[in-house]
């Protein structure tokens, strides 16, 4: 009877996972199709995967470590060997939407090993189903799935698989999953190393702990001491500057810029971030300290970092926290279940499940990613959608293009793609390597300046005044330039249009 119930529950979970994958794949592609995705980061990942697929391993013109040469190696910024595996699939369907679908499939499929873990720890298939379903509607997971593509999202199913394999004693699968998780991003050394320390404290898991620590230390040395400096002109990991305000971090020891403005987290921001993480879980991770402690170093460096996105569930950064929080939930339920069996009552165990359900449902009222994205119009075409399509149709494949952030993803399958807003200051010599320039003359949301409207007008003016580009297509706010001798009358009209936007103090969006 128990086995039949477990099979029925697993069958139900399969249907729910399939629904999740279909819905989130569709929404992610709708966001892409309506030009609401971003070159940072979907365009970056697409270009790196496309280049790698055709033998130019980790080559990028968008997210290189320095602003000296236009084309460089992505390995000077981040170390993500898992992109090599994705590049093999990309040859079958060379389209950014492949990455979006793969991400949805991976995040949805992660519910299965989480279910197996919770089932094993609680011996309760219904509770395991609740945990898996709460994972699928966890707000931070939904935002992660919708905000472009990030390889670190793949670490979630891999870590669940590793944890389950360790419980089952399937050590080959365990080590393979851990290694692949490390390959999703260099920062994975933090939770893997911490997990190793936790296992060192368990008498029967000390060998596992030593192995995890060894892998984390070796990968740390390779990433931060060898690979990144080698591809970054001998300079250290440039994102260390996000913690340069802390003791021990010298501002002179870091180099390069970041695509987002910097700001330390206020106490209110920290509290709100923690509530957004913990409330949907009914605060149950507090009952699973063995897994919760693995998340604490990552949580600490996110809270102490000076990038505002670090302190929000609306971006990809909580991806490193999500698996450990849900593993702590499962461990917490296991603890409540054991206490219930010893004291002859299931009241607190059931109360824990109620807290989890209420927290999940309650948090999704104000913080549902699908509803928030829909309210922002992220799945609907803008009134000038057809103009963007018409402009894109006039750009030949693999020609060099300079573009604004939101219009870059469909153009990422090319070696030369220059994003005009970043890195700052604008390198006109890089822009002049492009054959086309595609602009939304209104959208200045991602310009890193105190007055983005004026700075964006300055960028457009600089591009036009190079004298290298003429108007190929102009309809309303969408402008396509191509290499050639410009018409002074057309350029003057564009400059007047941009100047009027500044004079009117036109908002960057919509």
Residues of each region from the PLM?
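Start-transfer (signal-anchor) and selected internal transmembrane alpha helices
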Residues: 1-26, 119, 125, 207, ...
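Perimembrane helix-loop-helix junctions
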Residues: 1-3, 191-217
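Signature aromatic-anchored transmembrane alpha helix within multi-pass, membrane-resident enzymes
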Residues: 14-18, 126, 213-218, 336-368
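Membrane-lumen/periplasm interface segments of specific transmembrane helices
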Residues: 23, 27, 34, 205-297, ...
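Transmembrane-helix motifs of polytopic, lipid-linked glycan transferases
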Residues: 88, 96-122, 161
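Transmembrane-helix signature of polytopic, membrane-embedded enzymes
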Residues: 109-137, 156-157, 172-173
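Membrane-interface transmembrane helices that cradle and orient dolichyl/undecaprenyl
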Residues: 120-122, 151-154, 159-173, 200-203
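Hydrophobic/aromatic-rich transmembrane helices and adjacent perimembrane loops
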Residues: 292-342
């Amino acid at each position: 009877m128990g086995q039949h119930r477990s099979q029925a529950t697993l069958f139900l979970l399969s249907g729910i996972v399939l629904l999740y994958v279909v819905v989130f794949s569709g929404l992610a592609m709708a966001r892409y199709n309506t030009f609401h995705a971003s070159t940072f980061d979907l365009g970056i990942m697409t270009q790196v995967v496309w280049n790698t697929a055709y033998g130019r391993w980790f080559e990028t013109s968008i997210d290189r470590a320095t602003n000296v040469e236009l084309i460089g190696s992505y390995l000077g910024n981040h170390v993500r060997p898992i992109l090599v595996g994705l590049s093999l699939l990309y040859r079958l369907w060379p389209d950014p939407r492949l990455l979006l679908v793969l991400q949805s499939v991976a995040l949805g499929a992660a519910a299965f090993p989480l279910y197996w873990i919770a089932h094993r720890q609680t011996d309760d298939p219904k509770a395991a189903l609740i945990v898996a379903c709460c994972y699928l509607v966890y707000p931070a997971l939904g935002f992660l799935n919708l905000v472009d593509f990030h390889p670190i999202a793949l670490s979630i199913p891999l870590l669940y698989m590793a944890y389950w394999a360790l419980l089952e004693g399937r050590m080959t699968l365990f080590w393979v999953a851990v290694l692949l998780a490390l390959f999703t991003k260099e920062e994975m050394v933090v939770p893997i190393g911490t997990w190793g320390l936790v296992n060192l404290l368990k008498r029967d898991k000390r060998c596992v702990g030593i192995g995890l620590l060894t892998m984390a230390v070796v990968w740390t040395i390779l990433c931060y001491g060898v690979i990144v400096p080698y591809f970054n002109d001998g300079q250290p990991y440039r994102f260390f500057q996000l913690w340069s305000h802390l003791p021990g971090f010298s501002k002179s020891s870091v180099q390069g810029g970041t695509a987002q403005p910097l700001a330390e987290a206020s106490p209110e921001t920290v509290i709100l971030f923690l509530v957004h993480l913990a409330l949907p879980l009914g605060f149950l991770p507090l009952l699973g300290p063995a897994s919760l402690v693995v998340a604490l170093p990552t949580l600490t460096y996110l809270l102490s970092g000076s990038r505002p996105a670090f302190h929000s569930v609306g971006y990809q950064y909580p991806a490193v926290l999500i698996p450990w929080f849900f593993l702590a939930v499962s461990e917490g339920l296991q603890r409540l279940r054991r206490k219930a069996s010893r004291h002859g009552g299931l009241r607190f165990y059931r109360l824990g499940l109620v807290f989890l359900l209420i927290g999940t449902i309650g948090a999704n009222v104000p913080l549902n990613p699908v509803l928030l994205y829909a309210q922002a119009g992220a799945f609907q075409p803008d009134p000038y959608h057809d103009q963007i399509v018409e402009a894109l149709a006039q750009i030949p494949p693999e020609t060099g293009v300079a573009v604004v952030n939101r219009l870059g993803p469909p153009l990422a399958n090319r070696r030369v793609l220059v994003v005009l807003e970043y890195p700052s200051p604008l390198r006109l010599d890089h822009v002049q390597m492009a054959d086309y320039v595609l602009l939304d003359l209104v959208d200045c949301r991602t310009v890193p300046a105190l007055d983005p409207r004026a700075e964006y007008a300055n960028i457009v003016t600089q591009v036009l005044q190079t004298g290298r580009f003429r108007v190929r297509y102009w309809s309303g706010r969408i402008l396509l330039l191509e290499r050639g001798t410009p018409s002074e009358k057309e350029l003057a009209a564009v400059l007047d249009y941009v100047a009027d936007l500044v004079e009117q103090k036109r908002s960057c969006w919509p």
